[in-house]
Amino acid sequence: MNHLSIITDSNICKFTLHDLPDRPGIAAEMFGRLGDAGISVVGLAAAGAQLGRTDVSITVNSADAAKTAAVLDTARRELDAQGLSQKKDVAAVSLIADSLSHDPGVAARMFRTLSAEGINIDMITAGNTAVTCLIDSRFVPAAQRALEREFTGQLASR
């Protein structure tokens, strides 16, 4: 059993490019522009392509929100995306471990715990060492308390 840590970050902003062409080079172009502007992407989720188009959502540090909006608005026009949206009042809640692949069901437990608290998950990113849920920032304290209760005994000492 892994020792888990719960990390929260309320200092982020979510952007989504809607109905972006699904073709080689689009991601390189989009993330190249962000990198050239000195913007670090914190999280990324892409929807499966439908009819050759897709949505791409990213999270960035709130301090980079205005710069990100400008870069992505230009990208929207030049890359033929049909829209750009921004969400400011979001937070990331993450479960971190050395290897989540050794603990089957951790993500499901996290999702069930948040659901039981009435907390909607806006975006999910996951890898071998972390599962991160983007939620409404108002619910961070409740999410943290609920996850601490659910994972008692698995949490790394602070």
Which role fits each region the language model picked out?
Residues 1-158:
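A conserved regulatory-domain signal marking ACT and ACT-like small-molecule sensing domains
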